[in-house]
A protein has these predicted regions:
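Outer-membrane beta-barrel transmembrane domain signature of Gram-negative proteins
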Residues: 207-234, 311-313
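Gram-negative/organellar outer-membrane beta-barrel architecture
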Residues: 68-77, 83-219
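Cleavable N-terminal export/targeting peptides
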Residues: 1-55, 62
């Protein structure tokens, strides 16, 4: 079982608000009329000055990236930043996010979203992926997807608690993984969805310093899973919620008749609650449980932590 150290990402956001003021004067005759016309035009037309200098342009870009432009058919923005963790060392991550509405006549349903992300570090770690939620007209159904590939040079102590607590078992190896998770859910009641899901996982351990720690298990595993997912979602915004609740219960099966070398099942529960405290501040609570049973391959055993779990939300 891998020991997971806290992954800390430092992202610096710089914000600036720009405002402009117009002076309205009152005179007599033609000058007064011209100023009244200018005042009327100032009330109806806003001229935004282009930022000058590289720093101001970067600040303006970050400010605009946080705004939802509902008049655009596809609102896409890119953001990136440096990070550091004890496992992967220094790196740079980039995310391109898009918001769109499949039907122009549907102005009530939440916006669909898609994100393309990439990360690379000095320790030869990399991760590439795409994920998102496509919301069908009137929110009658949703398609959720997450596809990614990653490689990391990390450490291994063995399978199970007793082996992992022995520091003498520490060994290095390279871990490559490819994961695909897709679900299609129908809305059965307000904010309640249910539907099938499928997963495909490929895991490959390479350059193992102590292969005996795997206790004869395959260094390469390929698993296909199918199951059912139930979701409750009344968040105000899917990708950056400030209020509401999201609950998801997944039950997956990886049987042998799907060509799996390891047959096992998985139950996963995810709860998240968001409550606004004051402007731009939100308290968020998260509960995550992942249980596997059966002949679970070493690479799909549950771990503590991970980059997908919340540590702070402000």
């Amino acid at each position: 079982m891998n020991r997971v150290l806290t992954f800390i990402t430092f992202v610096i956001f710089i914000g600036a608000n720009c405002s402009s003021a117009a002076d309205n004067g009152f005179g007599s005759g033609q000058l007064q009329d011209e100023r009244q016309i200018d005042s009327t035009m100032a009330d109806t037309v806003t001229v935004k000055e282009k930022p000058k200098g590289l720093i101001n342009k970067i600040i303006a870009y970050f400010n605009e990236s946080n705004k939802v432009r509902r008049n655009k058919k596809f609102d896409f923005s890119i953001i990136g930043g440096p990070h550091y963790s004890s496992d992967t060392k220094f790196g740079i991550g980039v995310v391109g996010s898009g918001l769109y509405r499949p039907s122009a006549s549907d102005s009530v349903s939440p916006l669909s979203n898609v994100s393309v992300y990439a990360d690379a570090t000095t320790s030869m770690f990399f991760k590439l992926g795409v994920r998102g939620t496509h919301i069908f007209p009137n929110d009658k159904a949703r398609l959720n997807y997450d596809i990614n590939v990653a490689q990391i040079a990390t450490k291994f102590w063995g399978i199970g608690y007793e082996m992992a607590r022995n520091d003498d078992n520490e060994s290095k190896y390279k871990y490559f993984t490819s994961q695909t998770e897709v679900s299609y859910v129908w809305r059965l009641a307000p904010n309640f969805y249910i539907g099938p899901m499928a997963t495909v996982d490929y895991i490959n351990a390479r350059d193992m310093a102590k292969p005996e720690l795997w206790e004869g298990e395959r260094d390469k595993t390929f698993n296909i899973g199918v199951g059912l997912t139930m979701q409750y979602d009344n968040r105000d915004f899917l990708t950056n919620a400030s209020r509401g609740m999201y609950a998801r219960l997944d039950q997956r099966f990886n049987p042998r008749f799907l060509a799996n070398k390891y047959a096992f099942s998985l139950t996963e529960l995810y709860l998240a609650y968001y409550h606004p405290v004051w402007k731009s501040a939100t308290i968020a609570l998260q509960l995550h449980s992942r249980l596997t049973y059966g002949n679970t391959p070493w690479g799909l055993l549950s771990t503590l932590g991970g980059s997908d779990n919340m540590r702070g939300y402000f």
